[in-house]
Amino acid sequence: MYVSRLQLQDFRIYRSLNLALPPGVCLFYGANAAGKTTILEALYYLATTRSLRASVERELIALEAAGDLGLPPFARLAASLQPQPEAEMQTIEIVLQRKFGADGDLAPTTSKTIRINKIARRALDLIGQLRVVMFAPQDLELVTGAPAERRRYLDVTLSQIDGRYVRALSRYNQVLTQRNGLLRTSRERGRAASEQDLAFWDEELAKAGVYVLRERRRAVTTLDQLAQRLYAEISGSDLDLRLNYLDTTPAHDVPSFQAALKQLRREERERGVTLIGPHRDDLSIQLAEREVGSFGSRGQQRASTLALRLAEAELMHSRTGDRPVLLLDDLLSELDQKRREHLLTTIVRPQQQTLITATDLDDFSPNFLSQITRMHVDHGLIFPA
């Protein structure tokens, strides 16, 4: 799969963009704040419905945006996808729109409209239409950050591979909110939630949670093997990079998940929160049996995150038969020459679309530059180089 065209309207710095993209490697270069990262962010948003940088979605809508015919301001993102060389072109689109409040002023909330081949669909239906793997400087948080970062890594990867996973995860989070609300309000009112109510939510949580757990464990088994090989190639080190899924319950089916919840009934009532499940799990990332985030050098941490991202791409390819689009955001400037050359060699593959951003061309060899498409970005304008 590759993205043949990207269209943006009032998305961050881009008032109007209609950009044709090549199927191979494309380098966007220019000064900081020129709009390079926004290209990658737009594709990531179209693939996952999540923003990499915005804390609230209204930040994605350009300040200068104006609605049509009295409508509130909106941003539009659309991409044309070529799944296979002989396959029919597909289109995906997101329209993100501000809302008017009761007083007629703009409210802080937004609405989101999603279309696939011009037909309105749900957000869950969009995920997996376009598969991407994002490499970014903040990827170090995968090994140094909180467990939520590593859970997100697994969830974003699996959601793009498996439509059932994204639905199970969504259902799990919905049930978790309801169950936590029941526990919390019961504690605040000093009145225990009924066993019947909790048993109902236990079963619903277990039904969704067991699938999430099973797929995460299965993915980590494969990612462990892939990342071990890739780390050795990237670093040239004989240290083993190992991944291990750290679950808060060993449950493998609905009854065992329910039993684990029931064992914690008293403590959960006292604390007003669900204490076990996929939302509490973690991913252990170790070199020579020591956590990379705590004991690894900066170089080891960076090589580990690269191995994780490349493993993510290989997992997507092996599960779907389709190579994801690779998005590399100003990453090469942080790598030494050896790792930079290895990464560039790795990503230049047939049927592998790769979009790279950089501030200048000094990080790339003349031979590499001769094989790719270059585009210069300057304050929201893009020029072929």
From Swiss-Prot:
The keyword DNA damage applies. InterPro entries: AAA+_ATPase, DNA-binding_RecF, DNA-binding_RecF_CS, P-loop_NTPase, RecF/RecN/SMC_N, RecF_2. ATP binds at G30, A31, N32, A33, A34, G35, K36, T37. GO terms for biological process: DNA replication; DNA synthesis involved in DNA repair; double-strand break repair; SOS response. One of its GO terms (cellular component) is cytoplasm. GO terms for molecular function: ATP binding; ATP hydrolysis activity; single-stranded DNA binding. It is found in: Cytoplasm. Pfam families: SMC_N. Keywords: ATP-binding, Cytoplasm, DNA damage, DNA repair, DNA replication, DNA-binding, Nucleotide-binding, SOS response. Transmembrane segments: none annotated. It comes from the Bacteria. The keyword Disulfide bond does not apply. Its main location: cytoplasm. PANTHER family: DNA REPLICATION AND REPAIR PROTEIN RECF. Belongs to the RecF family. The RecF protein is involved in DNA metabolism; it is required for DNA replication and normal SOS inducibility. RecF binds preferentially to single-stranded, linear DNA. It also seems to bind ATP. This is DNA replication and repair protein RecF.
